[in-house]
Amino acid sequence: NQVLKEEWDFDGFVMSDFNWGVRDTVEAANGGQMMEMCETKYFGERLVKAVEEGKVPMERIDDAAVRIVRTLLAFTEADPKKALEEEPGCKEHINLALKCAREGITLIQNEGKVLPFHEEEIKTIAVIGRLADEEVTGDHGSSRVFPAYVVTPLQGIRKRLPHAEVIYEDGSDLEKAKTAAGKADAVVFVAGYDYNDEGEYVLKDESDTELGGYGGDRLDSLGLHRDEAEMLKQVGPCNSNSAVILIGGNTILMDEWREAVGAVLMAYYPGMEGGTALAEILFGDINPSGKLPFVLPYKESDLPEVVWNTTEQWYDYYHGY
């Protein structure tokens, strides 16, 4: 109320985080909260009762209503049917998605200058890893989007190399993966996470037990799944002309397998045109100019210990500086 609305002269409205962002009807309403998302738990009938009992002044309700309606009027089209001249997934949207993927993908390692691959030297390329052929675009929670289509890494490579033989193995059979890597002129591994590993929608009993996930947190390991790390360690040395594409939204430790492969690209969640951008980068059409938004430690022991089962958290005076 004081800083946001009075000192900063903010004329919009305040809404809560999704699901349990509000924990007290009276405190939230009197503190300036105006909209509870995404299900009504503490507002609604409870808020009506709080007003009737005099615990929340009607002025708070009037202020919230004016701010919400004012915002709606400011951004509402006169004719909602004409709000979008083109459908989602139009040419402009596709071009923007491709631009974001091209500019976001980050080169982490390039031993022996493996990348870019030389197209004229590649008659056979092996693409190995479960995520190579899956549409991994991010979380399945409140941030989930539904693109018209998704270009996977495998599809992007096949489209980029129409005259080469593209061998795909999901990595579950290490002997098949080794054979594919050994006979190929180049190898692309795809490994990492999806919404089951680090999405906010994940409940504890649905999380991967290897990572110790809870609500998307990886409590027990910042590395890859055990089978993927083992795949890179065993199959990587079968071909020195190799690159790893990492999929995920946060730090992925590489210490146990990085020396087994040539190049490493961090693709994050590259979106609907991610496979196209990855293929362009692998073959030098586009420079991987993205920057890491987080630190990749060499090993997990370099990080400070975290006590996950604590009931209180204490920050010293210099926290945040």
Name the predicted role of every residue range.
Residues 1-9, 158, 232-240:
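Surface-exposed amphipathic alpha-helices with a cationic face
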Residues 23-24, 175-177:
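Short acidic active-site motifs
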Residues 10-12, 164, 237-242, 261:
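A short helix->loop->beta-strand "cap" motif at the edges of active sites that frequently abuts
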Residues 136-139, 193-225:
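Glycine/threonine-rich flexible loop motifs
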Residues 39, 49-141, 146-154, 158-160, ...:
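Secreted, periplasmic, or luminal enzymes acting at the cell surface/secretory milieu
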Residues 184:
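An anion/phosphate-binding loop that grips the pyrophosphate of nucleotide cofactors and donors
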Residues 1-60:
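Second-shell residues forming the walls of enzyme active-site clefts
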Residues 14-16, 127, 168, 189, ...:
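Structural beta-sheet core signal
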